[in-house]
UniProtKB/Swiss-Prot annotation:
This is Large ribosomal subunit protein uL1. Belongs to the universal ribosomal protein uL1 family. The lineage of its organism: Archaea, Thermoproteota, Thermoprotei, Thermoproteales, Thermoproteaceae. GO terms for molecular function: rRNA binding; structural constituent of ribosome; tRNA binding. Keywords: Repressor, Ribonucleoprotein, Ribosomal protein, RNA-binding, rRNA-binding, Translation regulation, tRNA-binding. GO terms for cellular component: large ribosomal subunit. Transmembrane segments: none annotated. The gene is rpl1. GO terms for biological process: regulation of translation; translation. Binds directly to 23S rRNA. Probably involved in E site tRNA release. Protein L1 is also a translational repressor protein, it controls the translation of its operon by binding to its mRNA.
């Protein structure tokens, strides 16, 4: 991967994005936008939806667990931010406003396999399109290790076009740290769609800042 990406150029563009725009009263996130070309999204095999663990997460993600019984105990011991019981899930049925609010409140959700049919029915229609469906934790998997991984993770996926938008940093982080986060995301995209063939453009931008464009010819080593 390091042989494909021009790291010096990307780090300079990240520094430019950090300086661009007016100062704000809050710490802005830094987003990576990857625009691909020649990807036919009508083919299911061309879709991306995966988790990538960042080496320098801008902040710990908030995680909630749909849980009951032994899994509830394990989730509490793993330090999740909230427990949502089976009864609470059933109480959400038909309440689209409450489900949308819940989806916004947490970055990731976890659940045991036996709750997934209920969750698919109650929250699936709203969680699914938002990329918020729970990560299923099988009985033989350590819940704490899953939570620790999700604290540092971002979801890399396509929506309705071959574009990936991912938060890779925030103001206060160095361009080098943000670059290293960007590289792990680009590496995963490159596994599925070799960037030399599919990359059109990259962009870096702060929450309220202008996008800084990186053309493919600049982003890739010749």
């Amino acid at each position: 991967m390091s042989a494909v990406i021009n790291k010096e150029t990307l780090q300079a563009k990240i520094a430019e994005a950090l300086k661009a725009g007016k100062p704000r009263r809050f710490k802005q996130s830094v987003e990576l936008i990857v625009v691909l070309k020649g990807v036919d999204l009508s083919k299911p095999e061309n879709r991306i939806n995966l988790l990538v663990e960042l080496p320098h997460p801008p902040k710990p993600n908030k995680i909630a667990a749909f849980a009951h019984g032994a899994f509830e105990v394990s989730a509490k011991n793993a330090g999740v931010d909230s427990i949502i019981t089976r009864d609470q899930v059933e109480g959400l049925s038909g309440n689209k406003r409450a489900i949308r609010k819940l989806a916004k409140q947490y970055d990731f959700f976890i659940a045991p396999p036996d709750l997934m049919p209920l969750l698919g029915r109650v929250v699936g229609p709203i969680f699914g399109p938002r990329g918020k469906m729970p990560e299923v934790v099988p009985p033989n998997v350590d819940v704490k290790s899953v939570v620790e991984r999700l604290r540092k993770a971002v979801r890399v996926r396509f929506r309705n076009e071959p574009v990936v938008k991912v938060r890779i940093g925030s103001e206060g982080q160095s361009p080098k740290e943000i670059l290293e986060n960007a590289l792990v995301v680009l590496e995963e995209v490159n596994r599925k769609f070799p960037l030399r063939q599919y990359l059109k453009d990259l962009y870096f931008k702060k929450t309220m800042g202008p996008p800084v464009k990186v053309r493919a010819v600049e982003a890739l080593v010749k």
